[in-house]
Amino acid sequence: MAVIALDTPQGGARVHLHPAAHPIAALMLGHGAGGGVAARDLTAATKVAVDAGVSVALVEQPYRVMGRRSPPRAPVLDAAWTSIVEQLAAGELAGLPLIVGGRSAGARVACRTAAATGAIAVLCLAFPLVSPSGVSRQEELDDASVSVLVVQGASDRFGIPEPDPERSRSVVVVRGDHGLKSDPIAVGDAIAAWLMVVLAQIG
């Protein structure tokens, strides 16, 4: 594992790069609003992806590198993320088909920017379908026009998205809440099965 510092227009970002031995694709994952890249579901995703031949980049947004817990507005997050994707795609992850994703707020960023980053698929861990004030974020999820996997806790207080075969969106519900800490094995199994399908399509 290597830690890479990157500059973005929004400040310095940090990337934890877990390279596969013989990578056939890359997976970039963002953290939740107040959390970090050591979240249990991100750890599970990293392990199964690397085992499947996918190099993983866990991205710390600039505001977290600065020590802040509260995220900036969506356009700021999206701009920083897009800058990081572009730099990695031209550098450490050059030539690899790109899968993007994240947990909670990181999943929202990945969905909103999927088209701009040229992602072939999106992995959403604990996608917050409804905001704390009750506002639906369905449109953000629908913005991702590629294959999408949502892994959601059965008791997630922010709701559970519906699968949509027409949009190539599948949803796997596992034991637990928004933290997805209760059953990391089930989380990993769901991701591994989905990755097999995604990777077969680019093979």
Question: Where are these predicted regions, by residue range?
Answer:
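Gly/Ala-rich beta-loop-alpha elbow adjacent to hydrolase catalytic centers
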Residues: 102-110
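Hydrolases whose catalytic domains are alpha/beta-hydrolase-1, hotdog thioesterase
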Residues: 109-113, 133
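Conserved alpha/beta-hydrolase "acid-adjacent" motif
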Residues: 37, 153, 157-162
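Short beta-strand/loop motif that positions the catalytic acidic residue
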Residues: 143-145, 150-152
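A conserved short beta-strand
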Residues: 118-131
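Short beta-strand immediately N-terminal to the catalytic nucleophile in serine-hydrolase-like folds
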Residues: 97-102, 125
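Serine-hydrolase catalytic machinery in alpha/beta-hydrolase-like enzymes
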Residues: 4-97, 109, 173
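Catalytic histidine-centered segment of alpha/beta-hydrolase-like enzymes
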Residues: 176-189
